Structures are given as C-alpha cells and as structure tokens.
From Swiss-Prot:
Lipid bilayer topology: Multi-pass membrane protein
Subcellular location: Mitochondrion outer membrane
Pfam families from the UniProt entry: MDM10 (PF12519)
Listed InterPro entries: Mdm10
Name of the protein in question: Mitochondrial distribution and morphology protein 10
Family per record: Belongs to the MDM10 family.
C-alpha cells in the first residue's frame, strides 16, 4: 500500500499528465507488486492531512526495534492536485494499493491541453536519528522535468545527492541520472512500439503495446559498469477483455535472465509467475503470486454509456470514411442495362466496391466487439467498490511464504502481513536415525516466522 505522500505525488503526476509508467523503472512494476510486495515489519501508525490548498503533512510512528518516527511535509503549486487527493474515508482502495497495472488502451486522438509550469517540494525528517530526506520536482514543459533527491545522515556520515533529467515523448522515455555516490552516471531509455495510428482511421486504438528499454551505468570513481535491458508486452484477451502482461529482463554482465507472466483471471483475482535463471552459475528460481479482491458492489452501472460510446465510435468511423457514399447515378437499386458497355463496367466496379466494403465492415465489427469487451472489463474494475485484498507469494529457492491483507475499516486503511520460511525440522532427522518413518509433511518441515507487522493509515 502506498504511503500518503507517495499517493499525493501520484496525484501530482496524474494532474500534470505525466505518465510515470512509461519509464524504464516501471517495466517490471506489476511483478514486483504481485510477488515482491513489502511486508510491514513493525506496528506502524501514520496520520496525514491537507493543511492548506497546496501543502500536505504526515506524522508516522513505528515500533521497529525502538519507538521512532518521522515528520513529512509536501508542497505543490499545481491547483489540480487538490481535486484528486482524497482522504481515507473517500479514497478507493484500488487507487492506493500497489496491484496489477492495467495496460492503457492506446487512442490516437491528440488532446490539446494548456500547460502550466509546476513544482513539488518534499521533505522528511526521521527521529531520533535526525536523518533528512528531500526531493524537488520541476516541470518545465509537457515533456521535460527534473527531479532532485537528497539524503543526509549525521550518524552514518552520508550525504547523497541525485538528479534525474527526464524527457517523456509520445514513444520514448529518456532519463539521465547523476549521483554523488561514486559519481554514478546513468542513462535509461524505453521505446514504445505498436503505437502508430491506423492508416484508415486515426481514431483507432491498439489492443496491445510493446515496450523495449535499456539502462547503462558507470561509476566514475571506481569505473564499475552496469547495464540491463527489458522487454514488456501488454495485451487484452479478445474474448473476455482481460489484460495480461509478459516481461523479459536480461543483465549481460551478471548473466541474469528473468521472465514474468501476469494476468487478471477475473475482475477480482490476479495471477503472476516469475522465473529467474543465471547463465553463469546455472541457478534458477521459480516464484508465484496471487491476488484476491473482495468487493461489495458497483459504484454505478456504466453499460449504457459504454454501448453509447460504441455506437458513436462506429457511426463516426463510417461517416469519416464515406463507406456508403457511392455516386447516386450508379446506385445499387438502379436498373442496369447489360447492353450498355459503359454502364455494365460501372455496375461491375460498384459491385466489387460493395463486396470490399462488406468484407472491410465485417473486420471493423469484430474490432468494435473486442473494443467493447475491453472497455466493459475496465469499467467493471473502475466502478467496483473494493473493500479488501489478500496477497500471497512463494519462492521455491528461498522457500518462503508471504501473506498480506490490506483493506479499509471505517475511516482507516489497514495492512497486516507476515513472512514465513519453510525449514526442514530437526525432528525428522532424529526419526530417520531411530528407524521411525512418517509420511506427514508436518513432520518433515517446519515454518519459521521472519517478520510480522501491522500498518494503520488515516488522512483527513
């Protein structure tokens, strides 16, 4: 579950029409949300509120080892953020839980929006350690922004400064990163394929998308290089409209290859599988993750609006391409004189055009049905009132089990989870040496708790 300040920053990106999901760092975000989700390791209480129209603050207390906490302050001059940020009583659970990222259906209609330069300032101080975090986001244009992050720790004598120069165009997302830690320099780029509009109609959308990205790093002091490349393919099922995502990542220096498969089996369940392999050590790992949502009903029904949009889409398509605007002189209902050579040729030509239009319209109707199914499935998720979600994941090599429950109770957001490790029990070895045998798995294995925690959030 996102922290309150991360949620406000997400609203800042949405209000400024900045698509963070196009960056290279978000390529494998869905598998991380479903398999590598974070488990609270202590009792954590977070109280947040919006003090003014442009400022937000948050107080956090934790019992990790000892009682500690943090105080966070955020300021932004973007007016549209105020209308997006909601308190815990009104906030939909699906907007703050890190879950499956629905692939956006690509429309090719360019919307004209008025851009205003905006900024975001963030500061966080920890106590009793007095460590300080700071961040600044500055949007210079619809495609360019700069992010500056700082970390200072007096106890560890660490001061790190990192700057991100980002450019987000229609097909490319580029990042230039400079850090004071080892004078680290990096460059990230992700390119989006399958986003060119149709030659017949610019309003058509693509049911699938393909992302390819790479990153390159170099420490200027130690001269240690680093690089990786990733591929992501997102699409929807033509029969059900359910989305699925495939990713492939490769680190050539360390020989690590990772593949993932994520799919929504229904509007309230998700499955993810991840396979890791190292070509140098020949080690492998297989991980699984599931997600089950509980909902009480729909906020409102949208089938009528979806059907109206479908009819409007179909009508606009046929009007824009003049499929039935044949010359009235040679209409299909006219009597043709076979003896007239010219008229007979015109009749044959119009018949060929009619057959082509019929075949073409059949394909369009098929595309239109797929579009309706995809929109209906997305509307079911957006219009449903989810009250809780249960996550579970396991890894064969690490032999662990992770469970997480997140939900809402009255005006609070709750998160509770635990991580268990499967170990071979010592009693099983003693039974073997004494001649005793048992086929029970409970006698062969034991569960060791690694962490357990509860997080409570409240915002007004």
């Amino acid at each position: 579950m996102l922290d309150y300040m991360d949620y406000v920053q997400q609203c800042f990106d949405s209000a400024g029409r900045w698509k963070r999901q196009n960056s290279y760092g978000e390529v494998t975000q869905t598998p991380r949300n479903l398999i590598d989700f974070k488990i609270p390791d202590a009792v954590n209480l977070q109280v947040s509120n919006r003090s003014t129209k442009y400022s937000y603050n948050s107080l956090q207390l934790s019992t990790r080892q000892s009682i500690n906490g943090s105080l966070t302050y955020l300021y932004t001059n973007l007016d549209a953020v105020e209308g997006l940020v909601k308190n815990t009583e009104e906030l939909p659970l699906h907007d703050i839980v890190q879950t499956y990222e629905l692939p956006a259906v690509t429309h090719h209609r360019k919307e004209k929006t008025n851009f205003h330069k905006c900024s975001l300032f963030y500061g966080k101080i920890f106590y009793p350690s007095s460590d300080v975090e700071a961040m600044m986001i500055k949007r210079f244009s619809p495609m360019n922004q700069v992010i500056v992050k700082c970390l200072s720790s007096l106890k560890e004598n660490v001061n790190i400064f990192t700057a991100y120069f980002q450019r987000n165009s229609e097909k490319n997302f580029q990042e230039l990163i400079v850090s004071s830690n080892d004078l680290l320099c990096g460059y990230r780029i992700s390119h989006h394929f399958l986003r060119t509009p149709s030659k017949l109609n610019s309003s058509l959308y693509n049911n699938s998308s393909l992302f390819f990205g790479a990153e390159f790093w170099l420490g200027m002091i130690s001269l240690n290089p680093g690089c990786s490349t990733s591929l992501k393919y997102c699409t929807h099922s033509a029969n059900t409209g359910r989305p699925l995502t495939l990713t492939l990542s490769w680190n050539p220096l360390f020989g690590h290859i990772s593949t993932t498969y994520s799919a929504m089996t229904s509007s309230s369940s998700t499955f993810c599988a991840k396979y890791d392999f190292n070509i140098y050590s020949i080690e492998s790992n297989l991980s699984f993750g599931i997600e089950l949502w509980r909902k009480t009903g729909a906020l409102f029904k949208s089938e009528d609006s979806v059907e109206a949009n479908r009819k409007e889409y179909e009508q606009n398509f046929y009007i824009s391409h003049d499929h039935n605007l044949l010359p009235s002189k040679y209409g299909y209902d006219h009597e043709y004189n076979i003896s007239d050579g010219k008229l007979s040729k015109e009749h044959k030509r119009n018949k060929i055009i009619k057959d082509l239009n019929h075949a073409f319209s059949t394909s369009l109707q098929k595309i239109d049905k797929e579009k309706t199914r995809i929109e209906n499935f997305g509307n079911i998720i957006r219009n449903s009132h989810f009250t809780s979600v249960f996550k579970a994941s396991t890894s064969l090599r690490e032999r662990n089990l992770k469970f997480l429950w997140e939900g809402e109770y009255k005006n609070f957001l709750l998160s509770a989870g635990t991580e268990l490790r499967v170990l071979k029990a010592e009693e099983s070895e003693l039974r073997r040496t004494s001649g005793q045998s048992s086929n029970s798995l409970l006698n062969e294995f034991s569960l060791q708790p690694l962490k357990f925690g509860v997080q409570i959030q409240f915002s007004s």
